[in-house]
């Protein structure tokens, strides 16, 4: 007797923001979900979803009792090792498996990556589809113009290059050699870590 593997499904009552589902053979993330109960008729669930591979969005409406297949995605913590041409090489610290991630998937993550940076990686059928840096990273300032005397009391900013080659706007008192904390969600300076 051959036993087929069961595929997890989500009923409409399980739908919520952040749920990963499969539609037409591709993984989607529910980004918005609204429950609508009209005066007459059955309840409906209006969902806005993002395709995790292509980045496109999709709007769908489901009736109560409908179900969707769970996406076969796995999220794991990986460490950045090095760049190889246009690819980024990461390693899973638990299994020691290495993943080569193309530039198209990695996007502008290079701004925050130095050796050993831990990132979150989402895999679909064993291939990386999303790589996210930690919310905050600490980077050394390698190049910036001199601050003007008295700038510590005002909101004067200047561009500063960090060890990854990225440029961020920092307060006027930041100097070369300072370690700064950057918020990767909005790409902004948070604070100076050392003097």
From Swiss-Prot:
Signal peptide: none annotated. It is found in: Cytoplasm. Keywords: Cytoplasm, Elongation factor, Protein biosynthesis. Pathway: Protein biosynthesis; polypeptide chain elongation. Involved in peptide bond synthesis. Stimulates efficient translation and peptide-bond synthesis on native or reconstituted 70S ribosomes in vitro. Probably functions indirectly by altering the affinity of the ribosome for aminoacyl-tRNA, thus increasing their reactivity as acceptors for peptidyl transferase. It holds the Pfam family EFP_N. HAMAP family: EF_P. GO terms for cellular component: cytoplasm. It comes from Rhodopirellula baltica (strain DSM 10527 / NCIMB 13988 / SH1). GO terms for molecular function: translation elongation factor activity. CDD domains: S1_EF-P_repeat_1 (cd04470), S1_EF-P_repeat_2 (cd05794). Disulfide bonds: none annotated. Belongs to the elongation factor P family. InterPro entries: Elong-fact-P_C (IPR015365), NA-bd_OB-fold (IPR012340), Rib_uL2_dom2 (IPR014722), Transl_elong_fac_P/YeiP (IPR020599), Transl_elong_KOW-like (IPR013185), Transl_elong_P/YeiP_cen (IPR001059), Transl_elongation_fac_P (IPR011768), Translation_prot_SH3-like_sf (IPR008991). The keyword ATP-binding does not apply. The keyword Protein biosynthesis applies. This is Elongation factor P. One of its GO terms (biological process) is peptide biosynthetic process.
